[in-house]
């Protein structure tokens, strides 16, 4: 009998995950201090407001723009006067290969913003410093936790909308 050599068909070659930064840039920036210089004569008891959002756009196959929006506003506790408002849109273009679906969504909502956040944080700190306000050091953000919260909210909304089965 002749021996038959059976070669298993190679599984579809999977492209390894690849994340490359193509460019990081400031898309928009604004700093307002509407009550200067009178605000410097008030006691400095700030109340900080912080808003964070991301926006993604596919530019080409495997090429994405991610924009991190951060708005920081500070008012004085006693008077309610606005000390400053700082709005930053820090953006980046990323090549992302080898993933799709929920993994791609996670990369765009977590890994890319993790790259952008230190740039935005430094820019905000610099703007506040140039306004001659006390130093502002923004805390790190856990984008993985934010993404998981988003997924849980989506799941809860879908479950709430699903018709009840009797």
UniProtKB/Swiss-Prot annotation:
GO terms for molecular function: unfolded protein binding. NCBIfam families: PRK05751.1-4 (NF004393), secB (TIGR00809). It is found in: Cytoplasm. One of its GO terms (cellular component) is cytoplasm. GO terms for biological process: protein folding; protein tetramerization; protein transport. This is Protein-export protein SecB. It comes from Actinobacillus pleuropneumoniae serotype 5b (strain L20). One of the proteins required for the normal export of preproteins out of the cell cytoplasm. It is a molecular chaperone that binds to a subset of precursor proteins, maintaining them in a translocation-competent state. It also specifically binds to its receptor SecA. Belongs to the SecB family. Pfam families: SecB (PF02556).
